[in-house]
A protein has these predicted regions:
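A conserved acidic beta->alpha catalytic loop
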Residues: 27, 39-49, 62, 86
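Conserved donor nucleotide-binding strand/loop of the catalytic core
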Residues: 48-72, 76
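N-proximal low-complexity "stem/linker" segments adjacent to membrane-targeting elements
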Residues: 1-27
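Catalytic-site signature of metal-activated, phosphate-bearing donor transferases
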Residues: 7, 68-74, 91-222
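Short aromatic/hydrophobic "clamp" motif used to bind/position activated sugar donors
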Residues: 82
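Acidic helix N-cap motif at the loop->helix transition within catalytic regions
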Residues: 19-22, 44-53, 94
Length: 364
């Protein structure tokens, strides 16, 4: 066992990232030993900004393939381990300190390190939506990226699961770039893997092409192949699509279909609650919101939302009970939600409402 410390190359691919790249690099430049930036066609000040941090800037002709660009970036790294980030990712102060500690203590037998990825944060700085990615890998293993879009890094060997969180702070609006890559691949006669089909459906939904997304999700779910976690997630997103189309029964059926793959998840129970709530079926909604708080947290899932198991369903139960005229219960669940997110604006709004309803305060 060797814990004498490691050296790290940071690899990033960029294109028109002038708004975020400095923020990203500021958080890691004093930790990593090398910064490698691959530019895929920036026309803004991205490269000018990057030059202040590293001389290792390489141009790569964009070929609608994120894996190709990432593999090129990895090929330019020279240190023992490679850390990868996107330009709109950041390491908060606690994560910076944790990475410094990991760098000094990591067992050199470790081939890959996974880290939590906080994709969406609430007003209290807590993650609303999380996943986990392999972020730090041993260079000599020559691990490769696969997939034109929503690429993944294939790793093997000795794995270490760390608690160093990478935080995503997206600045750009949703575009149809990824959707077009899938569409072009299909037009060129390329066969999509189940994973590609899953992400093609996600991109279609993100671009509000709900009918297209429904067909893609249904096709994916009807295949025997495919990871069960992606199947569970696809059921929920299919439910979202049907809800957007006003097909309420199909929306519930789609979410409930996820139960065939594992015990009910808080994310899909909360979804079903929203579907009934939108139809003003408040008792049914309360049932599903309550269930969301009782099922076990799927913390090992790459697609989990901690809020869907606690304050989010409690807050919706507050609204449902209020609609049913049960203000005592409504107040109770508002305060229960507040125990998780005390500074939430919706909770404060509800408190003002209840002050107008009650002559006295209630405690949880």
């Amino acid at each position: 066992m060797n814990k004498q410390g490691i050296t790290i190359s940071l690899c990033i691919i960029v294109r028109d990232e002038e708004k975020t790249i400095a923020r990203c690099l500021d958080g890691v430049e004093e930790i990593v030993d090398e910064i490698v930036v691959v530019d895929t066609g920036s026309v803004d000040r991205t490269k000018e900004i990057v030059e202040k941090y590293t001389p290792n800037i390489y141009d790569f002709q964009w070929i609608d393939d994120f894996s190709a660009a990432r593999n090129f970036a990895f090929s330019k790294a020279t240190q023992q381990y490679i850390l990868w980030l996107d330009a709109d990712d950041v390491l908060l102060e606690d994560a910076q300190e944790a990475l410094k500690q990991l760098k000094g203590q990591l067992d050199s037998n470790v081939d890959a390190v996974s880290m939590p990825y906080h994709l969406v944060m609430d007003s209290n700085g807590k993650p609303l939506y999380c996943t986990r990615r392999y972020r730090l890998v041993k260079r000599e293993k020559q691990f490769q990226w696969f997939g034109k879009v929503h690429e993944y890094l294939a790793v093997s060997g000795e794995i270490f699961n760390s608690n160093i969180a990478i935080t995503h702070k997206k600045e750009k609006e949703v575009t149809d770039r990824n959707l077009k890559i899938f569409q072009n691949a299909v037009a060129a006669g390329e066969e999509l893997s189940p994973r590609d089909l899953f992400y093609y459906a996600n991109e279609s939904m993100d671009n509000q092409k709900y009918n297209d997304a429904v067909l893609l999700y249904e096709t994916f779910l009807n295949q025997d192949e495919g990871w069960y976690e992606e199947k569970i997630y696809a059921c929920g997103k299919l439910g979202d699509c049907y809800a957007k189309l006003g097909l309420w029964e199909k929306a519930v059926e789609a979410c409930a279909k996820s139960f065939r793959y594992d015990v009910p998840r808080g994310e899909n129970c909360t979804r079903i609650g929203y579907i009934y709530m939108d139809q003003q079926k408040y008792n049914e909604a309360i049932f599903w919101f309550k269930l969301a708080t009782e099922v076990p947290l799927a913390k090992d899932s790459p697609f989990h939302s901690p809020a869907s198991y606690t304050w989010l369903p409690y807050l919706q139960m507050c609204i449902c009970y209020s609609k049913l005229g049960e203000q005592d219960k409504a107040y109770y669940y508002n305060e229960l939600a507040a125990s998780y997110v005390p500074n939430n604006a919706a909770i404060e709004y509800n408190r003002k409402y209840f002050r107008g309803v009650f002559d006295k305060q209630y405690k949880v």
